[in-house]
Amino acid sequence: DYCCRRPTCIPIC
């Protein structure tokens, strides 16, 4: 999964 789809990650999408 991409970082965008991970609840533990806060990416800039």
Curated annotation (Swiss-Prot):
Disulfide bonds listed in the record: 3-9, 4-13
MF term (GO), any: ion channel regulator activity
Entry comment describing in which tissues the protein is expressed: Expressed by the venom duct (at protein level).
One GO term describing the cellular component: extracellular region
Modified residues annotated as Cysteine amide in this record: 13
Main subcellular location: secreted
Alphabetical UniProt keywords: Acetylcholine receptor inhibiting toxin, Amidation, Disulfide bond, Hydroxylation, Ion channel impairing toxin, Neurotoxin, Postsynaptic neurotoxin, Secreted, Toxin
Modified residues (4-hydroxyproline): 7
UniProt-annotated location(s): Secreted
Swiss-Prot/TrEMBL domain comment: The cysteine framework is I (CC-C-C). Alpha4/3 pattern.
Protein family membership: Belongs to the conotoxin A superfamily.
Biological role: Acts as an inhibitor of nicotinic acetylcholine receptors (nAChR). Specifically inhibits the alpha-7 nAChRs of D.melanogaster, and seems to have no inhibitory effect on vertebrate nAChR subtypes.
Annotated protein name in UniProt: Alpha-conotoxin BruIB
Native source organism of the sequence: Conus brunneus
